[in-house]
Amino acid sequence: MAFKSTRQEAIFGAVLKNLGELGYKDELLQKDYAFVDWFQPNNPVRTIPAAAFSQTPHSYDSACIAVVLSNGKCGRPLIVENRALGAPYAFEVTEKEVVHWRVGKDQESSRELLRISPDQIARTFEENRSRWAAPDVLRSKSIGFKLGPRQLDFIDLGLIPALERQISTKLDRILREVIQNATNSHRRLDLQSLYHLIFRILAGKVLHDRAISPFADFTSRDQGKILQEVARYYGEQQPAIVDDETRGLVFSAIWQQLDFRNLSVEVLAYIYENTLVDPETRRDLGTHSTPHAIARYVVHHIPFERLEESQRTIIEPFCGHGIFLVAALQRLRQLLDPKMDAVKRHEYFVRMLHGFELDRFAIEVAKLCLMLADFPNHNGWKLTPEDVFRSPTFIPTVRSCNVVLSNPPFADFTTKDRPRYEGLKSFRKPAEFLNRVLDYLPQNGMLGLRMPVNS
């Protein structure tokens, strides 16, 4: 980064020092942080002098505060240029002072909040600790946390939805073009095999952009190595599609057009639910998507604090890509000692979280989502590829868990399917699921469900 003067450099240093006093230390405070500007047509990569995050992995979801330098561009245009970081607050460092901004989804909703002279930086940061500290900013960004009128003056709740719309629209367009082009060049293409190939390449690109070894050193020319490493990483077989033309087409599009730096875990969930699951599969499984805002809302209202740390065991039946498991992991992380060793924290998450899902492809997606949520750990997740209504291990797992989170299938058991299931009390899947859970959930167990009204 380039400073106009030693005075501006000193003010910048003072801002970072006081961000550290608010808890933004080590990995939570990044200098020269690069992120993709999804608001712009060509998705340029921007680099910001400093960015403060509430937790790792770094993403627009966990971004809290942007620190920018007033060098050439300044004021509102500078703030809006960096809004794709996802931070609701920004500090603009000039040669004279620090300007505190609310970052909005556009020029109109971004506005100056406060001017801070250099000799007042420490005092002002301490006075605003309750608004600027990481836990408070994270809560303010979350749906389900009620903001008062004064807080709404400082936070633009439209920023993240606007950013997510841009990201999802562009990702969906790019991937649908990839699918269409691959289908045109390979007339007898099996779509499920193509979807698996696309997701493996996406996984490789995510790991590359997150600088995970050995993916960080790969390029689009290392197609075979990338697929082999992804398969090894997840303990899965390679995709069925191996012809050079199809593989090269998909690699070229994804590697050149997509950049997963600063993207949230929920982006992969969106890709899976909206692009890589065909309507027939969705209909056969009776599945329906769970918006991540709903999952977070449900998890936010589960009183985990009432349980001992070792008793916060969670099961997500019909977990799909693990939307509730990811939300629960993020909530459990907030309740843990922030000084806990990363390896021990991962082992704790693995002990606490359990998922059941019939669709093996969905489990593969869930593994990647959980890995990104607990970045960069990837081993040991307890995701069982079984039908909840026929699984010999489901009831014992329910008995061992104190929290059930789920969005069960809304469909009925068909006349053809009913003989396959023993002891059905209801032909409605939501009702049957609820019966089984209530029969075996431990006393004082907790439920967080998304259910149809007429189940």
Predicted regions and their residues:
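Short, solvent-exposed secondary-structure capping/transition elements
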Residues: 188-192, 207-218, 284, 307-311
